[in-house]
């Protein structure tokens, strides 16, 4: 009798183990089975928000997955990322954010996180940054601008969205190559305001994603782009690499991150979904209409990009803080 009971118990245990083994893959396969919250550290209606909503529309139509896009703008992106860092690491709360928010902001001010506080899921997009001038200014190239700024040190200035951003510190790195030229940095609230100021003659140079120049392509001349290669929309605009230094490369990179310790199978599933969405011809057509360039990388590669960003801007940020502390 006891042998019979033992055999039955052994059989039951084996069946239970088999069911557990089957349940684990099934759980992974069903993720996500409820809406995903995507926290945006930017305002509604701008390029990252548009990108998120285009991706969300694809996921809903193709897979029935709801992407709840929540804007939590302000505070240099800190409140949004702090909220994300405290979320449950189950893959149901993620963020579409920028390398600037993840790597530059934490080095400038205490904020309770670094880029290593998050799980990199996927790089999604790159925005080519450019320097635009008015043709009426007579500025024909970067070298020409620097020569003019040397001769008239109080005449020229460069505007860009945000006071303590990657653009600000890229500008600092660039100006080291032109110590006799004076082109001070002026912060604006956003790309729209900046372009309006340029068109009105209130600023000499605008530094912003070239997508902001495209609606005014005949009115604005792009004299340099900070990507590694020339931009498809402005093929005649040389890069800073061509004109100054091979290390002066900076694209405005956006990607998906989540809290630390999201299970690997869920990270992989999210990567698959976003990769598929960005490869869809319909999604690509919609992104092209709003001048957004898809640029997919898996999480591990996106993490390397974030480290490169952090390392590139560490020196100018340190220089800025030392100078500020000495004042």
Where are the regions a protein language model picked out?
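N-terminal secretory signal peptides that target proteins for export/translocation
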Residues: 1-7
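Bacterial N-terminal signal peptides
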Residues: 12-22
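Sec/Tat signal peptide C-region and signal peptidase I cleavage site
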Residues: 22-28
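N-terminal (or domain-start) structured segment
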Residues: 28-117, 155, 177-207, 212-216, ...
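An extracytoplasmic/periplasmic, membrane-proximal ligand-sensing/linker region
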Residues: 33-35, 265-327
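Hinge/capping helix and adjacent helix->loop/strand transition within the periplasmic-binding protein
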Residues: 83-92, 106-193, 240-242, 249, ...
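Solvent-exposed coil/turn segments that connect beta secondary-structure elements
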Residues: 99-100, 126, 136, 211, ...
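Anionic-ligand binding region
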Residues: 194-244
């Amino acid at each position: 009798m006891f042998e019979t009971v033992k055999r039955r118990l052994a059989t039951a245990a084996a069946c239970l183990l088999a069911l557990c083994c089957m349940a684990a893959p099934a759980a992974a396969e069903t993720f996500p089975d409820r809406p995903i919250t995507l926290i945006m550290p930017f305002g509604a209606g701008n390029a990252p928000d548009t990108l998120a909503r285009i991706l969300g529309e694809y996921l809903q139509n193709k897979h029935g997955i709801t992407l709840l896009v929540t804007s939590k703008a302000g505070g240099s992106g800190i409140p949004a990322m702090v909220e994300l860092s405290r979320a449950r690491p189950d893959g149901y709360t993620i963020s579409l954010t920028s390398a600037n928010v993840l790597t530059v902001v934490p080095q400038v001010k205490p904020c309770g996180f670094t880029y290593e506080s998050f799980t990199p899921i996927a790089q999604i997009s790159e925005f080519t940054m450019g320097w635009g001038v008015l043709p009426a200014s007579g500025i024909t190239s970067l070298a020409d601008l620097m020569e003019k700024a040397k001769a008239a040190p109080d005449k020229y200035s460069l505007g860009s969205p945000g006071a303590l951003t990657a653009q600000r510190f890229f500008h600092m790195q660039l100006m080291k190559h032109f110590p006799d030229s004076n082109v001070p940095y002026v912060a604006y609230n956003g790309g729209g305001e900046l372009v309006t100021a340029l068109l009105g003659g209130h600023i000499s140079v605008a530094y912003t994603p070239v997508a902001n120049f495209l609606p005014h392509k005949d009115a604005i001349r792009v004299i340099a782009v900070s990507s590694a290669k020339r931009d498809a929309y402005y093929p005649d605009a040389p890069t800073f690499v061509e004109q100054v230094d091979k290390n002066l490369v900076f694209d405005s990179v956006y990607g998906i991150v989540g809290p630390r310790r999201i299970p690997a199978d869920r990270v992989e599933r999210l990567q698959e979904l976003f990769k598929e969405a960005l490869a869809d011809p319909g999604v690509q057509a919609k992104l092209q209409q709003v001048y957004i360039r898809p640029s997919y990388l898996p999480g591990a590669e996106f993490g390397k990009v974030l480290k490169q960003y952090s390392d590139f801007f560490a020196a100018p940020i340190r220089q800025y803080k030392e100078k500020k502390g000495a004042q």
